[in-house]
Amino acid sequence: MANVVENLGKLERRVTISLPKDAVQKEVDSRIRQLAKNVRMPGFRPGKVPLKMVTQQYSGQVEAEVLSDKVGKEFFDISRAENLRVAGQPSFAPKTDATEGDYAFDATFEVYPEVKLGDVATAEIERTTTTISEAEIDRTLDILRKQRVHFHARGEAGEHGDGGGDTAAKEGDRVTVDFVGKIEGEVFQGGSADDFAFVLGEGRMLPEFEKAATGLKVGESKEFDLAFPEDYHGKEVAGKTAQFTITMKKIEWPHLPEIDAEFAKSLGIEDGDLTKMRAEIKDNLEREAKRRTQAIVKNQVMDALLKISELDVPNALIEQDQERLVAMARQDLEQRGVPNAKDAPIPAAMFKEQAERRVKLGLVLAELVKANELQAKPEQIRAEVDEFAKSYEDPKEVVRWYYSNQQRLAEMEAYVVEANVVEFVLSKAKVTDKEVSFEELASATAQA
């Protein structure tokens, strides 16, 4: 008898599964006999419990297991016979109008959609490019110097000159202060501290607080009002105005290291050669620029593919991906040390839009890869592993690490497939190049 597949919508389908009751009962009896060989009950030796008692105790549970197994197998057989590409898990519901002597269930499910790929030649891509200039190397060196800054206390040589006993605090100085803040005459939680240190100009403190500290000399005090923003993280003071008193305890002036052989050695240049140091910095910046520009163009390619493709997205796959994203979010919270992160009440609904995009993109990419034979080749995977390993001290060990784990290798394979897709689309689409500075590139990718 042919199976009737009902069409309930664009992707939703339903089939009826019938199971002869005598066949189900036969399997139930067989499993209970097997169970009776090992079952334990008070007053009986193992395996000596009367079959009737085992049946009374376990028949309901065993029947449910048998029905689940048989319904699942029957659904699999029907799916294969009807060439159904089932998306996600089906739901089964018992029917009340089953033929006498049968169990009957409705299996409701979704199928994978037909993906209509658009003409890649109509896609428009803006490809970001960047060239590492000497000025960019200088800017990076300046950042590296600031990361290695040393602060000199009063009475030591510093940027402000030797001694500098009456020098006032200014931007870049590390200051140590005592402060007390009050709202309506009462000190609030977190509103006071002794020997509190921060660097002026880093933005760690609210602007009014930094402004009050700027210009003070050691031993001087100042009173000022500070209006907390409405969105301030401390809800008990958000939107309120506090009266602060601040006293300068210590001023330390920043001293940046000179760019010399010792500085180069601190960056891993063993012989301290400054030319080698600049070349190494340039190589690192070029690698980073390549990574960032590839990420930008990949996102543009994916957006373009979604724009030119037509398909319906199975809700079952969206819901599955939502659950994955919730699990990932909880794992992230756990890694950050958040208590009870595994049970955090994260609603799946907040990930629906993201999950729909991910599922849709996955279906489009699968169709594009299949249609244009863009699968990853072993030599491509090895080339990417080798390239990744170059940035490590022992590249051979990194290569072994990748090839010793199938999951890591599968992740690299997925990366290569994406790269193949990007290359394919760029070879067909309307591409315009846009030159940006490395600083602009870093800012753009940080905001993405």
UniProtKB/Swiss-Prot annotation:
<dbReference type="InterPro" id="IPR008881">
    <property type="entry name" value="Trigger_fac_ribosome-bd_bac"/>
</dbReference>
<dbReference type="GO" id="GO:0043335">
    <property type="term" value="P:protein unfolding"/>
</dbReference>
<dbReference type="GO" id="GO:0003755">
    <property type="term" value="F:peptidyl-prolyl cis-trans isomerase activity"/>
</dbReference>
<keyword id="KW-0132">Cell division</keyword>
<dbReference type="InterPro" id="IPR008880">
    <property type="entry name" value="Trigger_fac_C"/>
</dbReference>
<dbReference type="InterPro" id="IPR005215">
    <property type="entry name" value="Trig_fac"/>
</dbReference>
<feature type="domain" description="PPIase FKBP-type">
    <location>
        <begin position="172"/>
        <end position="257"/>
    </location>
</feature>
<dbReference type="GO" id="GO:0051083">
    <property type="term" value="P:'de novo' cotranslational protein folding"/>
</dbReference>
<dbReference type="GO" id="GO:0043022">
    <property type="term" value="F:ribosome binding"/>
</dbReference>
<comment type="function">
    <text>Involved in protein export. Acts as a chaperone by maintaining the newly synthesized protein in an open conformation. Functions as a peptidyl-prolyl cis-trans isomerase.</text>
</comment>
<dbReference type="InterPro" id="IPR027304">
    <property type="entry name" value="Trigger_fact/SurA_dom_sf"/>
</dbReference>
<dbReference type="Pfam" id="PF05698">
    <property type="entry name" value="Trigger_C"/>
</dbReference>
<dbReference type="GO" id="GO:0061077">
    <property type="term" value="P:chaperone-mediated protein folding"/>
</dbReference>
<dbReference type="InterPro" id="IPR036611">
    <property type="entry name" value="Trigger_fac_ribosome-bd_sf"/>
</dbReference>
<dbReference type="Pfam" id="PF05697">
    <property type="entry name" value="Trigger_N"/>
</dbReference>
<keyword id="KW-0131">Cell cycle</keyword>
<keyword id="KW-0963">Cytoplasm</keyword>
<dbReference type="GO" id="GO:0015031">
    <property type="term" value="P:protein transport"/>
</dbReference>
<dbReference type="GO" id="GO:0051301">
    <property type="term" value="P:cell division"/>
</dbReference>
<dbReference type="GO" id="GO:0005737">
    <property type="term" value="C:cytoplasm"/>
</dbReference>
<keyword id="KW-0413">Isomerase</keyword>
<keyword id="KW-0143">Chaperone</keyword>
<dbReference type="InterPro" id="IPR001179">
    <property type="entry name" value="PPIase_FKBP_dom"/>
</dbReference>
<keyword id="KW-0697">Rotamase</keyword>
<comment type="similarity">
    <text>Belongs to the FKBP-type PPIase family. Tig subfamily.</text>
</comment>
<dbReference type="GO" id="GO:0044183">
    <property type="term" value="F:protein folding chaperone"/>
</dbReference>
<dbReference type="InterPro" id="IPR046357">
    <property type="entry name" value="PPIase_dom_sf"/>
</dbReference>
<protein>
    <recommendedName>
        <fullName>Trigger factor</fullName>
        <ecNumber>5.2.1.8</ecNumber>
    </recommendedName>
</protein>
<dbReference type="InterPro" id="IPR037041">
    <property type="entry name" value="Trigger_fac_C_sf"/>
</dbReference>
<dbReference type="Pfam" id="PF00254">
    <property type="entry name" value="FKBP_C"/>
</dbReference>
